[in-house]
Amino acid sequence: MNSSASSQVVSQRTSPVVSIVIGMAGTGKTTLMQRINLHCVEQGLRAYFINLDPAVASVPFAANIDIRDTVNYKEVMKQYKLGPNGAILTSLNLFATKFDQVIGILERRADEFDYIFVDTPGQIEAFTWSAGGQIIHELLANAFPTTILYITDTPRCKSTTTFMSNMLYACSVLYKSKLPLICVFNKTDITPFSFAQDWMSNLMTKLLIIYVSFSFLDDFENYQQALDQDKEEYMTSLNRSLSLVMDEFYRYQPLNSCARL
């Protein structure tokens, strides 16, 4: 094969897509990662997994790159005399200083996989609002097509206030990262997604991993009815105003739901 033909093959190669999994503590990010990993193995999908949680006791999925192999979370606590959250933040910042090496590995092996999944610390602010988290997501976005998966706890989102709080936080992450963001409603095996579907219109569904529904909030009538059932007048009024203010965010924001098998 001559050099021109070789360069044409390289130029036609599809770059792997990065999905950064974030969400509040307890929303099931790592469990979802484990199910994604299992699905990829069962379906023969070429995927690469990265763990960025330095404090996790054990990773329930096969991580190709693990921050714990580079940074010792407990030693960071001792050396810098930090608490748990401070040590997580510092560990992530230390790892970020070497993340260009991770990018180099991913670029060299880019033809070996189609998807890259990145699990983040349980404390969402440690990644989304830290210098280390910003460095990592910017390096990934500069090298590969990158999307943020914002995981929400479906049972807790039955509360209209919690639902609105999650959407506000998702909007702030979208605004700060400037990356495509998909809201994923997790734990639908515990609480069905029907209540959220009633708050949405133009619903389209498709099978992705377990169950995924792409939705766009285009009509707030059902959400307004749910607000009417709340007893706190101040919160009801605030949520009603916020739902209208954020109309443009809802209108074009893809929402997914998933459950464990």
Show which residues each predicted segment covers.
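N-terminal regions of ATP-driven nucleic-acid and macromolecular assemblies
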Residues: 2-8, 16, 54, 73-81, ...
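Nucleotide-state-sensitive switch-loop elements of NTP-binding domains
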Residues: 2-147
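Structured core elements
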Residues: 20, 117, 182, 256-257
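Cofactor-binding loop segments of dinucleotide-utilizing enzymes, especially the Rossmann-like FAD-
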Residues: 24, 52, 151-153, 186, ...
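Conserved catalytic-core segment of NTP-binding enzymes
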Residues: 125-248
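Phosphate-binding beta-loop-alpha motif at adenosine-nucleotide cofactor sites
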Residues: 253-261
